[in-house]
Amino acid sequence: DKTKVNSQDKPKATTPSEQNPATGDKPKAQPTTPNQPQSNAPATPHRPTTPSQPTPQPNPTPQPPAPQPVDLANSLRQEIEATYHVKVRYGAAETNGYAPRHTATQALQPNQYVGMLNELKNILRRYPNGFFREFRANGMPLTFYLVDSVQNNAFAGFFDRQFVNDLKIVLTRKDYFLSLTANHEITHAIDTFLDIKMYPREPYSEYTALNPAGFKYLSEDQNANFPQYVWKNDNRQNAYFATAYAQSTPREDRAELFKFMMRDYDAVGIFNNSPYLRAKAQVLARQINQNFATAGPNAYWNRLLK
């Protein structure tokens, strides 16, 4: 007969966590598969991957800026203005529209700037250091206008003192004797300075007292005519005036004489062989020396009088 097994007699199944009574050992844990995480294990958080960065390019070596073209004329102008304390104007943009005495000026061309600026520099360098700064310090700044011509070559240059606090000298390229003209016009600026510095005296009486008896300037008598007193090679001893134009006014007389005082040498013998002209030159030189702080016995205009 089949024997009936009682449910109580069946061997009891053990769990992995129960200890084997026979050996006292715990059963080995059953391996788990990687795709089956334990239900009690914490979930691993998702961490985004860092995208790959491009390799940085090496820093380029800094290059110096490209050199700018040098404006030679403007550099020369700045040098003149800084050294001699005057203003210089040239070119259409700076001189067009300036029409003193109702005249018209024709502007320099760009290729003429440097040449005329160099001539002006060579003229100004003969004056004492700081000489033109005295004009500015006394409220009479001086400006040079460099132009091609004035009124269809009617003038080689002129002095404009419409406003005493803004003296102007216009010089033209067409003048072949630029240094003589420039020094003539500078004399007018000097006399304007002396008019103020010597006030209430004036610089002309002492000078004109040396003229011959009976002489009159054209400004005093439009019919005046004294050619016998004008310097000529065969009239040196009796010369009182350097040129015929010097007989126009006392100011023109002084300017015509001073321009020869500023020459390199006494080419025509005005000061060695003409005693009356020499005497007038000595008065003019002394007045300048006494009223300009920068002037003195070593000033260029004294050379021919020693």
Model-derived features: positions:
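Non-catalytic architectural context of zinc metalloproteases
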Residues: 12, 42, 62-113, 218-235, ...
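Active-site-flanking segments in enzyme catalytic domains
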Residues: 136-306
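Generic detection of long, well-ordered alpha-helical segments
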Residues: 70, 110-117, 121, 252, ...
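Auxiliary, metal-adjacent structural segments of Zn-dependent hydrolase domains
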Residues: 88-161
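Ser/Thr/Gly/Pro-rich low-complexity, disordered linker/stalk segments of secreted
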Residues: 2-66
